[in-house]
């Protein structure tokens, strides 16, 4: 199933434009909660499925708040704009923000994070700058590449070593320890994601079964 994930500031104008686009796509809400600004502000995802013949079966997930991710206004300022065939433009999350959004309890997200950051490194390693080096040292999840970046950029490594425990083992190429710390990072993020979603899931259960317990 194809999916399209959207982040939106749920003010009146944006919601009006989104409703118009969803109507054109013949999209319908397929699960709780209902499509309201209140649910979006609360942090819920609204799930739609398209029934227009040219988009049939596409699922659209709309959110306004994501755990560990900056508020929408900052996401918008940092966005990446892509130009598609026909000169259409699409605004997408910057790579650092996408990586932050992917740090969930879902198994499928962690290999994606690893590939995204690794691909960015191999694309830009011959043209490093301060922001890129910091991004690599704080977000890479490939032990051998972490070692490579730490050794090539020792000044940045020294500056950032205290902010990420695995960097203490990078210069010595202690891959076993780097892997151990990566596992700890992932476990901590998964646990934090579960804590974040626990009250929201309870709200969803109440919406699904409003008469339960009465």
Task: Enumerate the predicted regions with their spans.
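Compositionally biased terminal segments of proteins
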Residues: 1-214
